[in-house]
Regions:
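Acyl-donor binding region in acyl/amide transferases
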Residues: 150, 159-249
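Non-catalytic substrate-recognition and accessory regions of acyl/acetyltransferase enzymes
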Residues: 1-184, 277-301
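Charge-rich, low-complexity amphipathic helices
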Residues: 113, 228-229, 260-265
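Charge-rich, low-complexity intrinsically disordered segments
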Residues: 246-301
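Generic alpha-helix signal with a bias toward terminal, lower-confidence helices
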Residues: 58, 154, 179-181, 206, ...
Length: 301
């Protein structure tokens, strides 16, 4: 096992001049030592070519996240190793090296769509940084005035039943304080809630890369449930929103499954007073879908 690489990974993520962070670094190194064969397997994966080496150097969290109880409740070492490698293999298979270089080697964001609200820029961007590593290997973030408003952390995987590419969502995060902003933005998008707009953006991305199904963690499946007492509840209720998005609980009750396509009511199903609003909303959604597809296609192999 290459000690220099592990030192680089650990010291990139932990501020070792702070005692608490130094303790975390020591625990990280201890975990790596205890599971040296598994860590060696991952290091060999990254050492396979210069591009992967650059990803690890630019995004050391890709190694560290396999050593901790991240992604979903009850994840094992073997599952996490497979998860990270499969995500990167699928990304390699789908996209030109330029995209991977931006996201992982350089830590840059990749814009998929833009609009405006209140004459200020609103964008949808792919992004990965260390603060997201607990819940995924990539995120889709809605930025307003350059600051993240909503984020969906996720990873790409192979469906266990048919081997097709799927998306797994580890978390959806929104603003702590921003009710007035969200209300205004919802009105500007013709009654379409910002959270739904965010998820629709992921659905557009999924469609653009040929993914038919999206899985998302339930409340019980959220990674933090590894550490939450049985008698306590999470502050975030994932389940209600996933059900609203046509989510159905899986046999593995840690996850919901949802279709990539969002159901749209026909004009005949809507009240006459709502039809004009929905036409404008659907037009906005179609603009987003086309923009995301064009952006993704520009990076696809």
């Amino acid at each position: 096992m290459e000690k220099n690489i592990l030192e680089y990974v650990g010291k990139s993520l932990y501020k070792t001049h702070i005692l608490k962070e130094m303790k975390r670094y020591v625990v990280f190194r201890a975990r790596c030592a205890m599971h040296s064969s598994k860590v060696d397997e991952l290091l060999q994966f990254f050492a396979a070519n210069s591009k992967r080496q650059a990803w690890l150097q630019g995004a050391p969290a890709l190694l560290e996240q396999t050593t901790r109880a991240f992604f979903y409740k009850g994840s094992t070492w073997d599952e996490r190793l497979e998860l990270v490698q499969n995500h990167l293999l699928i990304m390699e298979e789908l996209f030109k090296p330029e995209l991977m270089d931006k996201l992982y080697s350089k830590g840059e964001r990749v814009q998929l769509w833009e609009d405006s609200y209140d004459d200020r820029l609103l964008t949808l961007q792919l992004w990965f940084h260390a603060g997201q590593r607990k819940e995924g290997c990539l995120s889709l973030a809605l930025f307003y005035e350059g600051e993240p408003l909503y984020q969906i952390m996720f990873w790409l995987a192979k469906n266990k039943t048919d081997g097709k590419n799927v998306i797994y969502i580890g978390a959806l995060q929104g603003p702590q304080n921003g009710n007035e902003l969200i209300k205004g933005m919802t009105k500007a998008f013709f009654g379409y809630r910002t959270k739904n707009l965010m998820f629709y953006g992921l659905r557009c991305f999924a469609k653009a890369i040929g993914v038919e199904n999206i899985f998302a963690v339930t409340n019980d499946g959220y990674y933090a449930m590894n550490h939450v007492r049985v008698d306590r509840k999470l502050k975030t209720d994932f389940g209600a929103f996933w059900q609203e998005c046509e989510g159905v609980i899986c046999s593995d009750r840690r996850f919901y499954i949802m279709p990539t396509a969002e159901h749209r009511k026909s004009m005949e199903e809507l009240k006459p007073s709502k039809r004009a609003q929905h036409r404008r909303r659907f037009a906005k959604m179609d603009e987003m879908k086309a923009a995301v597809k064009a952006a993704v296609d520009s990076y696809k192999k």
